[in-house]
Amino acid sequence: MSTCKICKTELTWENKTLCIRCGVEICEDCSTRNKFKCDKCADKLKIKIPDVIRRSSIEDYKSCPYYFKLHVIDGNEPRQNVLARLGSDLHDLYEHIQRGDVEIKDIDTQTDWILSHIEEDYPEEDMNRVEQRARISNQSFIKLLPTLTNKAIAFEERINFSIGEGIPQVTIAYDRLEEDENGDLHIVDWKTGKVMSGKKLTTDLQPALYLQAVKEKYGKMPKSFKLVYVSDIDKQGNYKERTFHSIDGNKFVCKVGNKEYIQDISEQIKVVQKLFAQIKQGKFSIPAKPDYFKCKMCDFKEKGLCSGNDTQNWININEERQKYGW
């Protein structure tokens, strides 16, 4: 007499089947529950979810769950595009200037050093385009500094915080946290990309997660969150910005012209909780309507890890069928 390796139920010709990976005998009920595998083999295939997930990776999951899987779950590192690399290096430079480690008069010399190293790492890129963005960003940062009159209490601080039990923590890192004369907090974060506009001002997760992170760390919700786009300038050469002001401590409004865009912190947290639940369930399909430009430029496609939206979905489905004997 044989018994199921999982539940110890007596096996008969009516209920006996085999684990599709190792071949041990299990009952049909356990087989169905474990996707045709014994407990030992099922554990080996369980998705290892990180304890902490970056805010930017959450946005990646919203955009393309399969990209998130390849990067965060499988551990494949995408190559930074040249402008993202520039943005990262300039952020480091601006932090050192704020801290007093680098004098503002040396910003061009430091930028020349940054550009020389980028050119070494990206010999195929048009460095005139990269240098132009760097110089515009520096000019904007020089204009920005005198306007930052509140007391700075933290630079480039990373905060991990929980949004619920049984799901990963979120981690964020802002550029500058200020305190005004009334003791109220204000977040300032600069960007080297294009200014945020339209519906994205309501749906983007960065404002809500940054505000909630500071509340968790400092015990009170900031009064504002400002995004400064140092490389995106208007016809007068002034940098563009978007500022979210507190309405009631949980909702923030960003006014652009005659339009108002609301960020509801509680609702945005619920969005992230739902996304984390989907991640735990192993939902990593490519979206039906992906960002085709992002898909075309994806480094994972260049590395042969993804065949693009139309082809990769079929590959993934067929791999699942082979795994589970569908």
Predicted regions: what is each one?
Residues 24-42:
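Cys/His-coordinated zinc-finger cores
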Residues 11-22, 30:
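Canonical RING-type zinc finger of E3 ubiquitin-protein ligases
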Residues 43-326:
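RecB-family 4Fe-4S metal-dependent nuclease core
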Residues 1, 15, 23, 34, ...:
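Short metal-coordination and nucleic-acid-contact micro-motifs, chiefly zinc-binding Cys/His arrays
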Residues 3, 9, 192:
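Ser/Thr-centric signal marking residues that sit
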Residues 4-7, 19-22, 38-41, 295:
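Short cysteine-rich clusters marking metal-coordination/redox-active sites
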Residues 2-3, 22-26, 275-284:
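Short Cys/His-rich Zn2+-coordinating modules
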Residues 12, 27, 35, 46, ...:
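Short functional micro-motifs and their immediate structural scaffolds
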